[in-house]
Amino acid sequence: ADAQAYPAALRVIREANFIVLGPGSLFTSIIPNLLVPGVVEAIREAHDRENDPACTLFVCSLADMQGETWGMNCYDYVDALTRHGMRGLLDIALIHRNAKTSPMASGVFPALTDYSDARWYTKGRRTGKLAHVEATDELVEQVKELGVQPMVRDLVDPERPTWHDREKLARAFQEVLAACHSRQR
């Protein structure tokens, strides 16, 4: 049977002032929820409200997911969301970048377009090697061209480099909420 959205969840989305997509796996956590009939429409209703429109934030992943988002950069993540119903609905993309991970970001791989190419991309790559999602100045500008305001911050947990640091994320959320509030005035 086809997936159906829980009516109370759709109501809450329509009434929301702040909608957050992520952090999470792009193709197995975030986008599948957008494919459920009614979810994107509820986000659109909240976002397009005349009085007190909702602000929609996307929290970009810190690192690629083996077999899912290999080689995708920050622009690719936001573009994937726009191609899955979120065009014109994303206000801010929270993107990670810091001096320690930037050198690692240069070791990313081109996105797989055909699964048969997977062997080529993984050849010589050590299992468990971390590749942070690339976020160069040029890519951040491309995110802006999609109509999404990028907010670039150091968000990594120094103890667990594939996790967001919850305190850094909380501070960034406070900034986003302040930006959304001032935009609505």
Short names for language-model regions:
Residues A1-F27:
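Active-site gating loop/helix substructures
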Residues G71-R185:
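C-terminal functional extensions of proteins
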Residues F58-C60, I95:
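Structural beta-sheet core signal
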Residues T28-I31, M65-W70, T101-A105:
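Short acidic/glycine-rich loop or secondary-structure boundary segments that cap or lie
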